[in-house]
Swiss-Prot record:
This is Scoloptoxin SSD996. The keyword Glycoprotein does not apply. Contains 2 disulfide bonds. Belongs to the scolopendra neurotoxin 3 family. One of its GO terms (cellular component) is extracellular region. GO terms for molecular function: toxin activity. Keywords: Disulfide bond, Neurotoxin, Secreted, Signal, Toxin. Its main location: secreted. The lineage of its organism: Eukaryota, Metazoa, Ecdysozoa, Arthropoda, Myriapoda. Transmembrane segments: none annotated. It is found in: Secreted. Expressed by the venom gland. Residues 1-25 form the signal peptide.
Length: 78
């Protein structure tokens, strides 16, 4: 009975370790901020520029594109 409890305890600890490692894995996303080139820059321009710079022009990989003043914030899939 003691052996069974010991094996069960080790199995539970291993399951916990594996689940922690899975939650800290890379999500395949990145984010960055860059200065906009002119004042007429729109949110859509920000999204297109983010796609051009960081995803080889793939617009569907851009998750978030925000324009705040003279900065463009992008979050995208890598």
């Amino acid at each position: 009975m003691k052996v069974f409890i010991a094996v069960l305890s080790i199995a539970i600890v291993l399951i916990i370790i594996v689940s922690i490692q899975e939650t800290t894995a890379n999500t395949g996303e990145a984010e960055t901020t860059f200065a906009v080139p002119n004042k007429k820059f729109t949110r859509e321009d920000c999204k297109k520029e983010c796609a051009r710079r960081f995803t080889n022009g793939v617009l569907s990989k851009v998750i978030i594109a925000k324009l705040t003043g003279t900065k463009c914030y992008c979050k995208y899939k890598t």
